[in-house]
Amino acid sequence: MDKTYQPHAIETSWYETWESNDYFAPSGEGQPYTIMIPPPNVTGSLHMGHGFNNAIMDALIRYRRMQGRNTLWQPGTDHAGIATQMVVERQLGAQGVSRHDLGREKFLEKVWEWKEQSGGNITRQIRRLGSSVDWSRERFTMDDGLSEAVKEAFVRLHEDGLIYRGKRLVNWDTKLHTAISDLEVENHDEKGHLWHLRYPLVNGAKTSEGLDYLVVATTRPETLLGDAAVAVHPEDERYAKLIGQFAELPIVGRHIPIIADEYVDREFGTGCVKITPAHDFNDYEVGKRHDLPLINIFDKNAAVLAQAQVFHLDGSVNPNLDPSLPQSYAGMDRFAARKAIVAEFEAMGLLEKVDDHALKVPKGDRSGTVIEPWLTDQWYVSTKPLAEDAIAAVEDGRIQFVPKQYENMYFSWMRDIQDWCISRQLWWGHRIPAWYDEAGNVYVGRDEVEVRTKHKLGNEAELRQDEDVLDTWFSSGLWTFSTLGWPQQTEFLKTFHPTDVLVTGFDIIFFWVARMIMLTMHLVKNPDGTPQIPFKTVYVHGLVRDGQGQKMSKSKGNVLDPLDIVDGIDLDTLLQKRTSGMMQPKLAEKIAKQTRAEFPEGIASYGTDALRFTFCSLASTGRDIKFDMGRVEGFRNFCNKIWNAANFVIENTDGQDTGVNGEPVELSSVDRWIISQLQRTEQEVTRQLDAFRFDLAAQALYEFIWDEYCAWYLELVKPVLWDENAPIERQRGTRRTLIRVLETALRLAHPFMPFITEEIWQRIKGQAGKEGPTLMLQPWPVADEGRIDAAAEGDIEWVKALMLGVRQIRGEMNISMAKRIDIILKNASPSDHRRLADNEPLLMKLAKLESIRVLEAGEEAPMSATALVGDMEVLVPMAGLIDKSAELGRLDKEIQRLEGEVKRVGGKLSNEGFVAKAPADVIEKERAKLAEAEQALAKLAEQRQKIAAL
């Protein structure tokens, strides 16, 4: 093996070997174990969340594969309706062409062309992370097979009365001209206004204060043309007598009722609010409770209509209300209408006052435009009947959430679930399988031929297919079973469904997880006819944030690309990546400055294994995952440590007798100790992987390999390995232990760090007595409790403690590590005597001792530095070892320097001007500097005291 670890030299070639040999495919043997990759957007590229997700899933799938399970980890991508359509529209726009210029068919051809060119980007990146997915089964949500499954699901749900077409309020994107989901709406904090408007009372009604008008507070005066009522709180005494009376809607002249509803906050504004059921989600609910008309005043661009559209709550036209609107507003944009309405109120003397007001403004995450609640005809899934089985499946434990606390989030949403709007006014996506005749009748079927046959419509009847497509979440809601061949009862569907684990972020529990459970349980049945679940466990992880806990976003300039950490990136390229295409040049300057400070030389190349191990080590149960580059560096050093340890093992076992053919061996207490520690580590890593505590599994592995195997075992066995006079059986036993423990540790580490472990394993497998084409198909280590040796553990912990004690004294007294010293043991118990007799040669060599003896009873100890090992004292006589006055002088000088540092930094931090003006990270660095100096000062003072007492 090379002397230094170079991840790039091994990673790509190993992935190609694994993939070309079909090692990722199901073995066909053992109990099935399935994970479906949450399909990333085909438009996208890998972000840190994907990287984290893939590291976790691959750790699980490699672990179960090594346990002999018949594993299927199936990849795929999502067609990402709105995101993909926007990318292609932007490209066309750059050529001065719109999708409407091309027409639907030609535009869709362009989308497919773009998908073929760019769609492989994210799958290439998934490969780079070492993900052992079965690429032969890669799926795309617009594949022919999946498209058939989507149609089948829609038709069945419609036949079961669970899909209907209705007129309801949706999040309407006025730029993209489509309904969007709540997930695609971002609430922005903005400064706005609260307008207090007077609505005159009619029929001589008066308020308790004798006024002939109500003052209504609103943040959206532009919608008042569609007001259906004024609401007050039922217990608000100020307005009690007015409930059931009417107010006149200024500008329009319509009389609207004054109603009582607990939705009203008495403390907000005047305690009177306008109710506009067709333009506000909360008002829509109030409207349902009071049977108010729905008065739509906007068109699809959010411009005022020439005439309102008035409907009953069931969506039928309401002919009882005059739809007239003032002609001066016709065609006016909503925000222009806002200004005009406020001006007209002011001119009429009906504007009471205007207050500044903090608002949450909903905007489309892609278009950036203010979202309009808009009344429109859409297709809906009736979710309440579906939610019952989905709730029961989690309540009775058929589906478990890990961590368990996320079940409460799931229940709270499911028990208050609203019907799901599944239609989108886009061209790219699964077109709704519904047809309309000239009379407006709707027919649902798998295709037009089926519709004509089923409804006995002759070929002469003109049918037009619905223009809308389905919400992307509808097709991804069928992901676990549609990708296995449903509605056909394929062998893969029978074998690998239900799947075992879904790995996902908590932010899409509602949008994806819950809908998968509902749709799967309704559409897929067990052999006995009971609903089948999509997965047994939902592992929910937090969101990957930067080291300060900030969300990663382009505008913050803190986005990290996982592949830049794997392959490295120079500063200029990183700056270009972080600042290109930014709308605000000042922000770009700030981000460039911040990036130069954080990565003055760009990002070094750390390799895939270091990044994956970092992700696993961060996979705790919290909602936020703070990603720290320092950890990646630490785990890159861990990879180096493993590589160097392997080179040491190879040097000491290559061409040597390692006892793999059953030759007699003698195991020293050091060998028995490391074997015992290995059993405990096998138990711990397995237990934590089963509990989805990847952080604790990674920690156990790290501590065993770095602290026990590399830091101690490799040192403790050198005397035996390098002693030409050592018994052959003992040397053979040590060599066998050395290589077998390493080989087992590589198997344990493989799910986390597949590349480095495979490379080393291939080099040592013969000497370790193993055979096979790849580490990934080797059996998972199972602890042998019979090899846990408490006696050996006790003996070696004693040796370690004694050596650490000597090391500590050398450090405190400034004694060179190369200088041989005498030590005396005081208060030694019979067990200490035995341990000394067993390990004296080892201690003499490794602790660099001249002599070691036990203090006789009644003998007075010479002037010594002391360390404790249990009740036993380890004494290092100081005579001739140090020049006391010179050492005290050196310490005094260092103490003086540190006192100056403490005074300087402390003064800085007590300066109010500095603390008020300096950035938070600078203050934090200064505080850390102060704490470090104070700690060092305390240590030196203690050291000085010890030397002065000698």
Swiss-Prot record:
This is Valine--tRNA ligase. Monomer. GO terms for biological process: valyl-tRNA aminoacylation. It is an enzyme of class 6 (ligase). SUPFAM superfamilies: Anticodon-binding domain of a subclass of class I aminoacyl-tRNA synthetases, Nucleotidylyl transferase, tRNA-binding arm, ValRS/IleRS/LeuRS editing domain. A motif ('HIGH' region) lies at residues 40-50. It catalyses: tRNA(Val) + L-valine + ATP = L-valyl-tRNA(Val) + AMP + diphosphate. One of its GO terms (cellular component) is cytosol. A motif ('KMSKS' region) lies at residues 551-555. Residues 881-950 form a coiled coil. It is found in: Cytoplasm. Catalyzes the attachment of valine to tRNA(Val). As ValRS can inadvertently accommodate and process structurally similar amino acids such as threonine, to avoid such errors, it has a 'posttransfer' editing activity that hydrolyzes mischarged Thr-tRNA(Val) in a tRNA-dependent manner. ValRS has two distinct active sites: one for aminoacylation and one for editing. The misactivated threonine is translocated from the active site to the editing site. ATP binds at K554. HAMAP family: Val_tRNA_synth_type1 (MF_02004). GO terms for molecular function: aminoacyl-tRNA deacylase activity; ATP binding; valine-tRNA ligase activity. Pfam families: Anticodon_1 (PF08264), tRNA-synt_1 (PF00133), Val_tRNA-synt_C (PF10458).
